[in-house]
Each structure stands twice: as C-alpha cells, then as structure tokens.
Swiss-Prot record:
InterPro entries: RibonucZ/Hydroxyglut_hydro. It comes from the Bacteria. This is Uncharacterized protein TP_0404. SUPFAM superfamilies: Metallo-hydrolase/oxidoreductase.
Length: 177
C-alpha cells in the first residue's frame, strides 16, 4: 500500500488521501475536496485505476472534485449523506466494512457530526472529526476513535487539515483514571 497526501490548497478544502494497491493496480481516494492534474498524474504514474472515493462528510470541502474525477474515472462514491456532485453514490448506514481496491475499509459513523471515519489497516482518516494534537477525552471523536482502535494499538490519523498524528487507546484509558 502506498499513501499519497494531496494537501488542500485553500482553507475551505480538505486534504485528500490517495491509497494505491500496486499489486492490483487499483486506488481509492479519501475526500475529493481538490482534484488537480498532480493527483491524476499520481494515479496514472502508479498505473492504477481509481475504483472508489470515500467522503468523510458531504460538503463542498470534501466533494468539490468529484465531478472532475467522474470525467476521468468511474469510481464508486461512498458517503454518509447524498453526494450532490455524483449521479450515483452509496449511502453508508452506521458502522460497516467494505472491500475496495483490495483494501478492507471499516467505516465508523459519527451521527453527531454527520461524518464518517474510515479505517484501513492501522490508518484512520478522520476528516473534520478531530485534528492533530487534540487531547479531549469523552467527546464524540474519542468515542469513535475508541471503536476504531483495539486495545494498546496505535492508529495513524490523517486529518482534513494539518499533519498526521497518532492515537493509542491506552492513552485515553489512562486519562480516565
């Protein structure tokens, strides 16, 4: 698995994450807030076909590039609410797991925020659910992260804004004592 970070160029956009499965020549994208020729070139350079797009939330910041992607590829769009930018999208309902581009994508719903966290192996894509450096216990983000993280495991978190960070469930358990 190769992960490419495609940073947002404007504050109103979200960072996109491209995951390439080089053994299958397939890729998936987390959030499509900004699609540039650089992103498409990265997909093509790896000889991949974009098979799926997962949106952490359905707002302009995460889906503005969907229309562009649909002109070049035929990815399946997954989201928690109707995606206005895609003719067809699959609405996720609650927590679930899907197989796309050779990856098992575990989807964790956050009804309070109207968004999804996506976990692939030890990587978690949070969108706006949390940001790097947050240390709040007991909120909705911690509840979702605890569901996504098994005991004493460390997840690498990729956020809608800012650098990647990490999350260990044991840290939250210590904080609650």
């Amino acid at each position: 698995m190769k992960v490419y970070i495609h940073p947002a160029e404007q504050h109103t956009q979200r960072t996109s994450y491209l995951l390439c499965n080089l053994s299958l020549n397939e890729a998936l994208l987390i959030d499509a807030g900004h699609v540039s020729t650089h992103l498409i070139h990265t997909i093509e350079k790896n000889s991949c076909t974009l098979t799926a797009v997962f949106l952490t939330r359905t707002d302009d910041a995460t889906q503005a590039g969907v229309r562009t992607l649909l002109r070049v590829y035929s990815p399946h769009i997954f989201c928690g609410e109707k995606c206005w930018n895609a003719h067809e999208s699959t609405l996720l309902q609650g927590d679930c797991s899907l197989n796309c581009a050779g990856f098992t994508v575990t989807c964790f719903a956050s009804p309070a925020y109207g968004c999804y966290l996506y976990r692939i192996a030890h990587l978690a894509f949070t969108g706006d659910l949390c940001s790097a450096g947050y240390e709040e216990a007991g909120n909705e983000a911690d509840t979702i992260l605890e569901r996504a993280c098994t005991a004493h495991e460390t997840l690498i978190l990729f956020h809608g804004h800012g650098p990647p960070s990490s999350y260990t469930r044991a840290r939250t358990q210590r904080a609650s004592h």
